[in-house]
């Protein structure tokens, strides 16, 4: 709470409903008040930070990661390059480079909605994460951004495994 324009009731309400329908307990986290991620947190969801994390939040998230915690990072396209040192430090733990300015635009008209290159129908790759929506045509991305990761050798050194969940043209 406090680092993103999104919350469980604003911008993320559909994700919130979906996760609750899957019998998950969902709660906002005020990491500045607690100074840590709760021990019973199975997955920490981070949504498009609009300011850098302070040291308290960064240390709490890094501690959570180092204890084997799971992160679901959702990021929309950005219009201006920002230097979020602490956000980038957390991303680097997983071999993810800082997010770049710009949105993905589809070039294959058969994968667009209403011939709009900003409304993308991705190819969902099969995995444990996507098995319930694999072969679905109901997934559309708007304002999507590219995720750049380090090369395979660097990922191996970080002990990080990359799994493609979706692909676009």
PLM-predicted stretches and their roles:
Residues 1-169:
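Short, surface-exposed patches at the edges or C-terminal ends of soluble domains, predominantly
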């Amino acid at each position: 709470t406090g680092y993103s324009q999104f919350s469980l009731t604003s911008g993320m309400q559909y994700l919130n409903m979906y996760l609750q329908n899957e019998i998950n307990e969902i709660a906002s986290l005020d990491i500045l008040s607690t100074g840590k991620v709760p021990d019973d947190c199975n997955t920490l969801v981070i949504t498009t930070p609009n300011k850098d994390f302070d040291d308290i939040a960064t240390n709490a998230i890094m501690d959570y990661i180092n204890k084997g915690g799971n992160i679901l990072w959702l990021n929309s396209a950005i219009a201006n390059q920002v230097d979020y040192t602490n956000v980038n430090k957390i991303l680097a733990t997983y071999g993810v480079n800082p997010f770049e300015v710009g949105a993905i635009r589809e070039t294959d008209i058969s994968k667009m909605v209403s011939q709009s290159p900003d409304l993308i129908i991705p190819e969902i790759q099969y995995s444990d994460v996507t098995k319930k929506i694999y072969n679905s045509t109901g997934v559309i991305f708007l304002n999507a951004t590219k995720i750049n990761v380090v090369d395979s050798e660097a990922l191996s050194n970080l002990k990080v495994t990359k799994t493609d969940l979706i692909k676009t043209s």
